Regions:
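Transmembrane alpha-helical segments of polytopic membrane transport and secretion proteins
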Residues: 1-37, 264-287
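Periplasmic/extracellular loop-to-transmembrane helix junction in inner-membrane transport proteins
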Residues: 22, 50-98
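Hydrophobic alpha-helical elements at and bordering transmembrane segments
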Residues: 82-86, 90, 120-127, 167, ...
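Transmembrane-helix boundary motif in ABC transporter permease subunits
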Residues: 95-125
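Generic hydrophobic transmembrane alpha-helix motif, especially the helices
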Residues: 126-162, 169-170
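Transmembrane alpha-helices
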Residues: 153, 157, 190-223, 250, ...
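Short cytoplasmic-facing helical segments at TM-TM junctions of multi-pass membrane proteins
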Residues: 163-209, 232, 236
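Hydrophobic alpha-helical transmembrane segments of polytopic membrane proteins
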Residues: 233-270
Length: 287
């Protein structure tokens, strides 16, 4: 067989398909996650028990669980119940998160539409963001008191910046080709924004929402550290004064769960709305 015949025959042999790495199914991944968590809790419990570590230093997971049971089983009207504190903190977080995100995204839209607005606003926004939010809390308490309003205002300030910056970056990420095509068809400014600019910016906006969510929780709790009657941050300070370390850990577990739950909800919305984004397609293929 000649060299040409060998080459032709080789060209007809289908190339070996590369095997993609096997990704565990969602149910298997969930089981693996729970197994890791259970193993860590077991090691933690055994270590504290065997070393006889003082629970003021590091409480056992069983003690933290009992603190959670006590907090959730106490009458809702009592001071020991966790429910009033969760309701207070969540109202501060959600209200400030919605208003701050809407304000940041709204001003980002205006700034992209009018370059002068962005030029004038950006120095003030960056200067405000450079200030630690906890440093603004005492001033907000002087202005608005120890109640809901001061925490609400601080959460707005904390969530505004991620949406403002990410919104501008997303709106400016639109390529010239689609814009010129829409303009050539005589599309209005609103049609271009709603059909091209805003959908293109959605991955950036969701990234800003995820960052803002973390800032909302941390800023609300930090403001509650400085004063108030209700809130998970207030509860942590009271427990710190009584050396109730298992109680402090239990409140931290609640905050971690709240953050995880909000992240899951945002992730679900992102997958439903921005399913066409390359990152979401890659995640869908991995499943």
């Amino acid at each position: 067989m000649s060299t040409d015949q060998l080459t032709a025959a080789a060209s007809r042999v289908p190339p070996k398909q590369r095997r993609s790495p096997r990704v565990p199914r969602p149910s298997a991944r969930v089981l693996l996650l729970f197994a890791i968590i259970a193993a860590l809790i077991t090691v933690w419990e055994a270590t504290v028990t065997l070393t006889k570590t003082n629970e003021i230093i590091l409480p056992k997971p069983s003690s933290i669980f009992l603190a959670l049971v006590d907090g959730f089983s106490a009458p809702v009207t009592s001071r020991a119940s966790y429910f009033p504190h969760i309701r207070q903190t969540m109202s501060e977080v959600l209200a400030g998160y919605v208003v701050g995100s809407a304000a940041g995204l709204g001003l980002a839209t205006i700034s992209v539409r009018f370059a002068l607005v962005e030029y004038l606003l950006r120095p003030f926004v960056v200067a405000l963001q450079s200030m630690p939010k906890i440093a603004l809390a005492p001033l907000l308490i002087v202005w608005f008191g120890f109640g809901f309003n001061s925490k609400f205002a601080l959460v707005i300030l904390a969530t505004f910046f991620p949406l403002f910056v990410n919104g501008i970056a997303g709106f400016k990420s639109v390529e010239e080709g689609p814009l010129r095509m829409m303009q050539s068809f005589g599309a209005s400014a609103w049609q271009i924004f709603s059909k091209v600019t805003f959908p293109t910016a959605l991955p950036y906006i969701f990234a800003g929402l995820e960052i803002g969510m973390v800032h909302a929780i941390t800023s609300a709790v930090a403001a509650e550290f400085l004063g108030g009657q209700l809130g998970l941050g207030v509860e942590i300070i009271i427990m710190e004064q009584t050396l109730d370390v298992p109680g402090i850990f239990s409140v931290l577990m609640i905050l971690a769960f709240i953050g995880w739950l909000m992240s899951v909800l945002l992730g679900y919305l992102r997958r439903r709305i921005v399913y066409w984004a390359p990152v979401e397609r890659a995640r869908a293929d991995a499943r």
